[in-house]
Amino acid sequence: MSQFSFTKMHGLGNSYIYVNMFEEQIPEEDLALVAEKVSNINTGIGADGMILICPSDVAPVKMRMFNNDGSEGKSCGNGLRCVAKYAYEHKLVEDTVFTIETLAGIVTAEVTVEEGKVTLAKIDMGAPRLTRAEIPMLGEGETPFIRENFLYNNHRYAFTAVSMGNSHAVIFVDDVEQAPLTTLGPVLETHEMFPERVNVEFIEILNEEEMNFRVWERGSGVTQACGTGACAAVVASILNGKMERGKEITVHLAGGDLMIAWTEEGNVLMKGPAEVICHGVYEYKIEA
């Protein structure tokens, strides 16, 4: 029997099991199965996945994110805010502004601290990637993939593709509560045009500075929030002429609100909360 200490945290209801790999050890070959086990709500702790906070050669910390199906993702906006909170409060970093390595690249975090506790985290997510090769999608072309039609159940849905280090298909609807989240979501997630699968977002524009948001996450299904998805939604809204670049947009997710801005300089900034749920020790056994 093996075990490790963990902290369960969430960003707007998007919860992960966080493991401090400065102190804990999980064999590389076990990570996918451990992520699947620990995320199980009936036989594990229950979460949208597992995130490792690791040493890095190029930043103070490195984030590795595993979905609850065991697949490894390249980035996670809500996870990054929680990693920023954990790293500062556990003295893995000293400054309130620091970098975090991810499989999608290095991002910059800035934390707001009150009485020694992080109350808010802002992440510079970098520039969105908009070509087919960057997303990635099958096909050729260097122009952004904007409002292309997808036929499902005799209905045409127009989506815009954006990568924020992980791929997103953003669909505009009149009412997110009536969107085909659990039906079209998994169909588009696993469509052959996305070789690495895709996160699917449904967006309802409320006005020039607000939107409602629902998400089907790659490898996790319906979740309360998706930080990179909120960033992709704002980028897609601007590409479609629905919102203005440089303004801070309020994204209303099922779990709460995020503030997103696609700056004139090119980067996307995400600001929102990160909270601790509990700490504990998880025991597991890998069958031979």
Swiss-Prot record:
<dbReference type="GO" id="GO:0008837">
    <property type="term" value="F:diaminopimelate epimerase activity"/>
</dbReference>
<dbReference type="InterPro" id="IPR001653">
    <property type="entry name" value="DAP_epimerase_DapF"/>
</dbReference>
<dbReference type="GO" id="GO:0009089">
    <property type="term" value="P:lysine biosynthetic process via diaminopimelate"/>
</dbReference>
<feature type="binding site">
    <location>
        <begin position="227"/>
        <end position="228"/>
    </location>
    <ligand>
        <name>substrate</name>
    </ligand>
</feature>
<dbReference type="Pfam" id="PF01678">
    <property type="entry name" value="DAP_epimerase"/>
</dbReference>
<feature type="binding site">
    <location>
        <begin position="77"/>
        <end position="78"/>
    </location>
    <ligand>
        <name>substrate</name>
    </ligand>
</feature>
<keyword id="KW-0963">Cytoplasm</keyword>
<comment type="function">
    <text>Catalyzes the stereoinversion of LL-2,6-diaminopimelate (L,L-DAP) to meso-diaminopimelate (meso-DAP), a precursor of L-lysine and an essential component of the bacterial peptidoglycan.</text>
</comment>
<dbReference type="InterPro" id="IPR018510">
    <property type="entry name" value="DAP_epimerase_AS"/>
</dbReference>
<dbReference type="GO" id="GO:0005829">
    <property type="term" value="C:cytosol"/>
</dbReference>
<keyword id="KW-0457">Lysine biosynthesis</keyword>
<keyword id="KW-0028">Amino-acid biosynthesis</keyword>
<feature type="binding site">
    <location>
        <position position="14"/>
    </location>
    <ligand>
        <name>substrate</name>
    </ligand>
</feature>
<protein>
    <recommendedName>
        <fullName>Diaminopimelate epimerase</fullName>
        <ecNumber>5.1.1.7</ecNumber>
    </recommendedName>
</protein>
<feature type="binding site">
    <location>
        <position position="166"/>
    </location>
    <ligand>
        <name>substrate</name>
    </ligand>
</feature>
<feature type="site" description="Could be important to modulate the pK values of the two catalytic cysteine residues">
    <location>
        <position position="168"/>
    </location>
</feature>
<feature type="binding site">
    <location>
        <position position="199"/>
    </location>
    <ligand>
        <name>substrate</name>
    </ligand>
</feature>
<feature type="active site" description="Proton acceptor">
    <location>
        <position position="226"/>
    </location>
</feature>
<keyword id="KW-0413">Isomerase</keyword>
<feature type="site" description="Could be important to modulate the pK values of the two catalytic cysteine residues">
    <location>
        <position position="217"/>
    </location>
</feature>
<feature type="binding site">
    <location>
        <begin position="217"/>
        <end position="218"/>
    </location>
    <ligand>
        <name>substrate</name>
    </ligand>
</feature>
<comment type="similarity">
    <text>Belongs to the diaminopimelate epimerase family.</text>
</comment>
<comment type="pathway">
    <text>Amino-acid biosynthesis; L-lysine biosynthesis via DAP pathway; DL-2,6-diaminopimelate from LL-2,6-diaminopimelate: step 1/1.</text>
</comment>
<comment type="subunit">
    <text>Homodimer.</text>
</comment>
<feature type="binding site">
    <location>
        <position position="67"/>
    </location>
    <ligand>
        <name>substrate</name>
    </ligand>
</feature>
<feature type="active site" description="Proton donor">
    <location>
        <position position="76"/>
    </location>
</feature>
